[in-house]
């Protein structure tokens, strides 16, 4: 996973964990 999506902060949260 290269980074957060602009569409969803939730995606970033789960990807970082």
Swiss-Prot record:
Metal-binding found in the keyword field: yes
Enzymatic class: oxidoreductase
Protein's organism: Daucus carota (Wild carrot)
Segment forming the signal sequence: none
Family designation: Belongs to the peroxidase family. Classical plant (class III) peroxidase subfamily.
Function description: Removal of H(2)O(2), oxidation of toxic reductants, biosynthesis and degradation of lignin, suberization, auxin catabolism, response to environmental stresses such as wounding, pathogen attack and oxidative stress. These functions might be dependent on each isozyme/isoform in each plant tissue.
Cofactor note: Binds 2 calcium ions per subunit.
Cofactor(s) this protein requires: Ca(2+); heme b
Protein name listed in UniProt: Peroxidase 5
EC number: 1.11.1.7
